Amino acid sequence: MKTTKDFWVMKNEGKKIVMITAYDYPSAKQAEQAGADIILVGDSLGNVVLGYDSTVYVTMEDMIHHGKAAKRGAPNTFIVADMPFMSCHLSIRDTLLNGARLIQETGAQAVKVEGADEMIPHIKALVRAGIPVVSHLGLTPQTAAVLGGFKVQGKDGEAARKMLEDVKECQEAGAFALVLECIPKQLAQEISTTLTIPTIGIGAGVHTDGQVLVYHDILTYGVNRAPKFVKAYANADQLMLKGLQDYADEVRSMNFPDDEHSFTMKEEELKTLYGGRG
C-alpha cells in the first residue's frame, strides 16, 4: 500500500496519481484490481448510490457504512474518506471526533475536507491529531448552493487569485494532497506548479499531478447525465440491462433453469419419497 510520502515522490518524479471514487465492496475491489493508487469513498455516494439530489443529506453513518465496505474490497489500497456535510464545521472537538470515527471505524488512511478559510483551523487540528487530510477546492459540492450551483470556479482574475491563496493555506495547514474540481486548466497548472503537495484534478485539465473520476461515471453505470469533464470508458448499463432482460426472457420461456443449473437425486432415493412406489 502506498503512503502519503509515496504520493509526494510521484509528484516529484512526474508520475501521475490515479484516484478512483468507489463506494462499496465490488467497486473498490475492481478499482484495486485496476491498479488505482488511491480510492476515494466520496460523499457523492449520496447522488450516485443513494439517489439524493445533493451530498448534504449524507451522514457520518452513511460514510462509515460505505467506507467499511470499500476497505474490505480494497485492503491493499490507500483509502480516503470524505468528511460529510457539517461533520467538521461546528467545533474543533466535533471535527476531531468525526475524523477519528472515519479512520477507526472504516480503516481509511485519510479524510477529505472541502473548503479553506474557516476550515483551516480544522485541517490543522486533524493533522496535529495524526489524521492525514486531503483538501478539496474549486467546486465544492457541499456548498454548491452558496457558489451559485454546479459551475466552473476561478474563471476571473480575482477568483483565481483567491484560490491561489486558499490552496497555499491548505498546504501550510498540513494537507498532504489537494483535489481541484471544475476549475480552468491554466489555473490548475499554476496551482500544481506552485504547490509542493500533489494535486488531483476532476474537471481541471491534464496538468494536475493526478486525476479522479467516479467508478460509475467511468463505466456508465446508473448514470443519467454525466458532467462535461467525465469520459466514459465502458457502457456497463447497456451490458447489464441486456443481461437482466435475457434472464427475464428465459424465466418466462422456461429455458431457465435448465439441467445445467438444477440439482437431481438418485432414482432409488426418489422412490422412497413416494413410499417405495415406482
Swiss-Prot record:
Subcellular compartments: Cytoplasm
Cofactor entry: Mg(2+)
Tree of life domain: Bacteria
GO annotation (BP), single: pantothenate biosynthetic process
Cofactor binding: number and manner: Binds 1 Mg(2+) ion per subunit.
Active site: 181
InterPro entries membership: Pantoate_hydroxy_MeTrfase, Pyrv/PenolPyrv_kinase-like_dom, Pyrv_kinase-like_dom_sf
Annotated disulfide bonds: none
Transmembrane segments: none
Chief localization: cytoplasm
Pathways per UniProt: Cofactor biosynthesis; (R)-pantothenate biosynthesis; (R)-pantoate from 3-methyl-2-oxobutanoate: step 1/2
Molecular function terms, GO-annotated: 3-methyl-2-oxobutanoate hydroxymethyltransferase activity; magnesium ion binding
One Pfam family matching this protein: Pantoate_transf
This protein's UniProt keywords: Cytoplasm, Magnesium, Metal-binding, Pantothenate biosynthesis, Transferase
PANTHER family for the chain: 3-METHYL-2-OXOBUTANOATE HYDROXYMETHYLTRANSFERASE
Function: Catalyzes the reversible reaction in which hydroxymethyl group from 5,10-methylenetetrahydrofolate is transferred onto alpha-ketoisovalerate to form ketopantoate.
Listed name of the protein: 3-methyl-2-oxobutanoate hydroxymethyltransferase
Organism field: Desulfitobacterium hafniense (strain DSM 10664 / DCB-2)
Gene name in the database record: panB
